[in-house]
Amino acid sequence: AGTLLAVMKAYDDKKFTLNNKISDFIPELKDSDKKNLAVKDLLYHQSGLTPTINFYLNAIDKDSYKGSLYSNAKNQAHPVRFDARTYVRNDFSFLPNLVSARKKPGFTTEIARNMYLHDSFKDTIIREIKDSRLGVRGKYKYSCINFILLKMMVEKQMRQPMDRLLHGMFFSKLGAWHTAYNPLHILDTMQIVPTENDHFILSLIHISEPTR
């Protein structure tokens, strides 16, 4: 909902038109099969983009574990439940050039407590989207990737990161002081309501420590 608010504001400010190609704002897509996707295709979820991409896999050190990362059954090597039918191991670590346990130059994106992502990872995200399989355009299929690209477009056109834009233009004016994209920056953890019982993310926070 936050991204859509920002998209509507940018549209009102004439920062784009619905018929603009998303590659007009993300030039890395110009030499791909996504080059002609229109902004309206993304908004309507009719772009043909894949529903989701597990970007985090690019940050995992594949030499830090043996065997498969996932299993369809819980066992000694895969003790953590990932979803209804998938279990994941918890003995892997992240690539130290991509994930840090503290904020430092080049590692400014906080993704969890004591877990920072390298700024260059945005290029990895764009590359993964660029190389992903494109389905049938014009047919409804929900995709998180649509709104990732819309976020990138809005941030570029409005010249602000999404969290600051939404706080300054919407949340603060509404007095919605407990609404934020990065709640760890403004709220105590006891004031943040969990959105899901995600043991995998908890494991990620724990095992990021070897990358210090």
Model feature map: region roles:
Residues 17-32, 173:
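Short, glycine/proline-biased beta-turn/loop segments that scaffold the active-site neighborhood
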Residues 35-204, 208, 212:
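Short, surface-exposed loop or secondary-structure junction motifs
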Residues 1-18, 42, 147-155:
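Active-site SXXK
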Residues 2, 22-23, 130-134:
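General secondary-structure edge motif
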